[in-house]
């Protein structure tokens, strides 16, 4: 996410096998809170295919992947609670996927995937008074990520 890398002079990407790479910023968009990074891994890396976020429905099961509080790669599950959520005030973009899958600080930029293992969205924010997950998390739909 843009809010994660904004103002950074050096960005490191750590893969699940603990390999670290310096990342190059290809694109940032504060309006949608998206950022695109590139690493030179020297070999093809696994990747997720895009899901059709326009076909998602309230009640669909989803998995949120991230690094909450820096503890390491974590997967949580939940459902899509709402679509096209507009009163989020996270960025200028107004059509977030809302989920009750636990999303905490450190999950930003992580994948929200569907039960087919496809990228449905990019985790970006939570509503929380405590700073932890209250079951109200938001992801940027894959439709926008693909643009």
Predicted regions and their residues:
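Serine-dependent protease modules
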Residues: 1-147
